């Protein structure tokens, strides 16, 4: 059974009454499976990696926002120049939490979002302000920290609402991420995507690489392998069926690619999660 590192708020918050703090990781090294007694919002500001989160596995890259709750188990792996801005908070210490909770996903709502580059730039400025104020213990700084945090939550939420209302307002790069997520089990043709959105293939490839430090093919492969790993640990489907569901018609090739990423065969990976 995998050991889980337990992280306490005592190690991160400046005082027992402090409601919020900021922990920036530039760069984030691989970090073992852990849980903590506080909530966390993680904003990926650069690079990429794989996020192991409870029973699911996802690739993460620039623009991802993760809402981690107290007690969640998670870790980072396969990191490549990964920069994280972590906002740690304790709901029971937030006087504005009755308002804030309306802007935080809960229960079965999606807890992993994407924001565009414009929003990411705006957030960087707010997080820098929050980092300064959250390290102070006077009452005015604690109140200001809550106000800045609320502004951050609203900005992220508003961005999602605007993008949901008008697909045309989503940046072309975000449209590409959406298309890739819908292509895990089938072929993805970049030329067709670019023709549909009136884009130059070379330009899309260049911008994607600048934003994620990965090629489009590398990102799609990570998506497929993460989906496969999630299915292996949560279902009894055969390796061959999972390979097909994740876009690999040849199960032997799938096993080879899987082994290069997870350092074991699909069957060996599954065996780690079988209850004895």
UniProtKB/Swiss-Prot annotation:
A GO BP annotation: rhamnose metabolic process
GO molecular function: DNA-binding transcription factor activity; sequence-specific DNA binding
Keywords: Activator, Cytoplasm, DNA-binding, Repeat, Rhamnose metabolism, Transcription, Transcription regulation
SMART domains named among the record's database cross-references: HTH_ARAC
InterPro entries hit by this protein: AraC-bd, Homeodomain-like_sf, HTH-like, HTH_AraC, HTH_AraC-typ_CS, RhaR_RhaS-like_N, RmlC-like_jellyroll, Tscrpt_act_RhaR
Pfam families the record matches: AraC_binding (PF02311), HTH_18 (PF12833)
Record bears the keyword Cytoplasm: yes
Domain HTH araC/xylS-type: 174-272
Coiled coil region boundaries: none
Protein origin, superkingdom: Bacteria
Location of the protein in the cell: Cytoplasm
KW Transcription (keyword) present: yes
Matching SUPFAM superfamilies: Homeodomain-like, Regulatory protein AraC
Residue ranges: DNA binding: 191-212, 239-262
HAMAP family xrefs: HTH_type_RhaR
PANTHER family from the UniProt entry: ARAC-FAMILY TRANSCRIPTIONAL REGULATOR, HTH-TYPE TRANSCRIPTIONAL ACTIVATOR RHAR
Complex and partners: Binds DNA as a dimer.
The protein's role, per its UniProt record: Activates expression of the rhaSR operon in response to L-rhamnose.
Protein name: HTH-type transcriptional activator RhaR
Organism the protein comes from: Mannheimia succiniciproducens (strain KCTC 0769BP / MBEL55E)
Gene from which the chain derives: rhaR
């Amino acid at each position: 059974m995998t050991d889980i590192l337990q992280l306490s708020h005592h190690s991160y918050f400046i005082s027992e009454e402090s409601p919020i703090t900021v922990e920036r990781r530039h760069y984030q090294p691989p970090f073992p499976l852990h849980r903590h007694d506080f909530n966390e919002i993680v904003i990926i500001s650069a690079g990429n990696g794989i996020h192991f989160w409870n029973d699911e596995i996802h690739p993460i890259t620039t623009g991802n926002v993760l809402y981690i709750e107290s007690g969640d188990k998670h870790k980072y792996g396969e990191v490549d120049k990964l920069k994280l801005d972590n906002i740690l908070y304790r709901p029971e210490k937030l006087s504005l939490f009755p308002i804030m909770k309306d802007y935080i996903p809960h229960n079965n709502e999606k807890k992993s979002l994407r924001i565009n580059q414009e929003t990411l730039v705006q957030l960087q400025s707010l997080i820098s302000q929050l980092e300064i104020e959250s390290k102070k213990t006077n009452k005015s700084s604690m109140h200001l920290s809550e106000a800045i945090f609320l502004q951050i939550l609203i900005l992220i939420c508003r961005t999602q609402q605007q993008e949901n209302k008008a697909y045309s307002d989503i940046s072309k790069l975000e449209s590409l991420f959406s298309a890739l997520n819908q292509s895990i089990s089938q072929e993805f043709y970049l030329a067709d995507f670019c023709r549909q959105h009136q884009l130059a293939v070379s330009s899309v490839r260049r911008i994607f690489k600048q934003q994620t430090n990965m090629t489009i093919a590398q990102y799609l492969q990570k998506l497929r392998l993460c989906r496969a790993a999630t299915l292996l640990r949560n279902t009894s489907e055969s390796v061959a069926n999972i390979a097909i569901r994740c876009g690999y018609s040849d199960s032997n090739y799938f096993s080879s690619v899987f082994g290069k990423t997870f350092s074991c065969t699909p069957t060996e990976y599954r065996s780690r999660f079988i209850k004895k």
